[in-house]
Amino acid sequence: MTVHYLNGKDSGLFKPLTISNGKITLEHRVVHAPLTRNRGEPLNHSSTPDHPNRIWIPGDAVVEYYSQRATKGGLIISEGIPPSLESNGMPGVPGLFNSEQAAGWKRVVNAVHAKGGIIFCQLWHAGRATIPQMTGSPAVCPSASVWDSPTECYSHPPVGSTQSVLYASHPPIEMTVEHIKQTIDDYCNAAKTAMDIGFDGVEIHSGNGYLPEQFLSSNINKRDDAYGGTPEKRCQFVFELMEQVAKTIGEQNVAIRLSPFGMFNQARGEQRIETWTHLCEGLKKTLPSLSYVSFIEPRYEQIFGAEEKDKFLKSWGLLDVTLDRFRQIFGSTPFFSAGGWDDQNSWGVVESGKYDALLYGRYFTSNPDLVHRLKEKIPMAPYDRTRFYGPFEDNTFHYTDYPTVDQN
């Protein structure tokens, strides 16, 4: 029998959802995904090759962007915010480790709250996915693991250059235990600042091949101490990080983002099911009151053809790459999904019980009124992929200048 699900305003997407262990009630389940846009303003405007600017703050354009996309009772997850200079992975990304940055993010928070919206701060540590020209220090990693491909380049040329930088030219250093503890402290300090300036919660980015997932990935983490060597030990960093952040700001204010089947930034470790099952079971046991968990859908069609994909998954023993097992582990914890949702494939997902909320990214860039469009079944404006990632001379073009339906 064919099941017909309602769409638009009658969809389950527009039913309330409680997160943060009952502290917050969302009025709808259309969530703004964390989107790096590289539109921050440099703290040092006289950046030179010898003295490059390495710190960015949220300026007027960033405030306007978030304000445009805020809705009453709607959740926005911020772009990835570095908790330290060392953690910064890209130019134009405002961090949260000095007073100027905190003041800028407070303006963003206030703008979202003025619209009745809710905003979480996503903390993001690039780990080995950066270069010394960006941070002023060597990239860090669980192990001194070079990138698999010797031709893999950093995303942006350094200040004063048009030449791409090879990651292989700047191999990461292995983190000492003391360095690991300091990094966790950096996260905790940034999380406390986030709550102090009004963010409604903090999400720890533990996917997409960044530092936490580097610890989880056997092809990157070659340690043989408490932080590596087995699936269980490779989870230890994330366990400690989440527990310490929860102690700092309250468990109900903490969320996590995971990509168990992703391969971004060459996170191509094995024992996927064993590792992420142990991780999720441990998180559910030790932190049962997390605000929510957010998962990135496996989308191998973007990397492989059908035959190549099946061959690859079989080589890993991965015949089932759905998120169902993790949904079952987390039970009543609100479970979010990101990965290609639009105005065609969103309907019936919440009603089926598969996920509690859906994250939208690319279409939010070009549709500041995306929630209204979904609700009223109005077609989406196309996005401009060439303007996803700045910085640009004009940071507002195809960032804050997209009109709403009413403005059209």
How would you label these PLM feature ranges?
Residues 1-408:
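Flavin-dependent oxidoreductase catalytic cores
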